[in-house]
Amino acid sequence: QVVGLLSVQGLILKKGTIVDSTIIAAPSSTKNREKKRDPDAHQTKKGNTWHFGYKAHIGVDRETGLVHHVEVTSANVHDVTVVPALLTGDEMEVYGDSGYLGADKREGAITRNTSGKAIRYRINRRPSQSKNCTLRSRGQIRRREREKSSVRAKVEHVFGVVKNLFHFSK
C-alpha cells in the first residue's frame, strides 16, 4: 500500500532499481527454551566467515533511494535467484553487485519492462574479470565500475539504517 501511495505521488519513478542483500544474524545456539536452532535460518559463507541467519533482499528506486520491494530468505539462498521478485517491471535499468552476475540470463528473468523495452542490467564485475585487459581498457573498465558503484551506494544507505538505527537482528 505504501509503495502504491508513493508511486501515485511520483516519489517512486521506476526508471531504475538497485538490488542488494544483507545477512541478518540469528542466534545459532541451542541454549534456548526449545533447545533447538531456528528451523528457518541457515548458514552461509561470506568471504572466509560463516554466518547463521537470514538474508534481506531489497529493491530500491534508483532516483529516490526509497525501498519498493523486500524479500527475506534463509541465508543460504543465492542473491541472483531473488531478482525477479525485487523488480517492479517498469524499470529501464537494474544495478547490482557482482553477486548478481547472470541475473538477466537466468530462467524466469525479467528482460523487458511493461512497455516492452529491454531492461539493461548494469551489474558490477568481479575484480578478477579485468586482469587480462590492456592497461588502457582496464582504466575504462575501472571508470565504468566506479560509476555503477556510485549509483549502488543508495542501497547501502538503506542497510545502514536498518542495521544501525533499528538494530535489526533476530
Residue ranges and their predicted role:
Residues 92-93, 98-170:
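Helix-centered, glycine/charged polyanion-binding patches within enzymatic domains
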Residues 1-111, 117, 124:
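Polybasic low-complexity intrinsically disordered regions
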